[in-house]
């Protein structure tokens, strides 16, 4: 029996949603990215042993649906520049680059071990087709000053402190889109952190399509003003507060 294509594998997992996703992405690139993650996983230390057996559903598919949600809700287009912080081997950020109508993508990570392998694959390997629309930034997020339309992150800094770490990266009226699991319960603290760093909560996008891996949602945080005086704080102060909040 011939091996299943990546489209067939994904259709088995999400049979009702796949016909909607299929026309949005370049599936040859999706397959090549999946193959890269499997091939270089041990070298790059991309995933835990348990997750290494679930790369397609827990990482590729989860990221594809995140990207699709932001595109279909109008937050990402060909004219957008998107920065994905703490991207590791390009998750979820690289999947923006495999949209048929792809934005300009900036992959950000201070650790070169994982991301440099993806850069090599794009430069001279199976992902060279996206070379002109993907750029790499090896720097600490809190040290980057830029003007990105959209900044995304899956698991770099606990929410809502991601807003403080990334505020210098997001342009005025730009958006920060954390990809989150369980809802954040301390609404007073959320409002305080967002307000101190110039953000307001514009929208929350639930992702019932990902219930097979757990609860997932996206916050749409719009940067409406400059941070208040004294913000963003030093990285050590932010870390200290996140640890105290998490007990």
From Swiss-Prot:
Task: Give a Gene Ontology cellular component term annotated to this protein.
Answer: cytosol
| TM stretches of this protein | none
Identify the enzyme class: transferase
* Alphabetic keyword roster: Cytoplasm, Methyltransferase, rRNA processing, S-adenosyl-L-methionine, Transferase
Q: What is its EC number?
A: 2.1.1.-
Recorded GO MF terms: rRNA (guanine-N7-)-methyltransferase activity
Stored PANTHER family: S-ADENOSYL-L-METHIONINE-DEPENDENT METHYLTRANSFERASES SUPERFAMILY PROTEIN
Per its UniProt record, what HAMAP family does this chain match? 16SrRNA_methyltr_G
What this protein is reported to do is described as: Specifically methylates the N7 position of a guanine in 16S rRNA.
Q: Output this protein's name.
A: Ribosomal RNA small subunit methyltransferase G
The organism of origin for this protein: Leptospira biflexa serovar Patoc (strain Patoc 1 / ATCC 23582 / Paris)
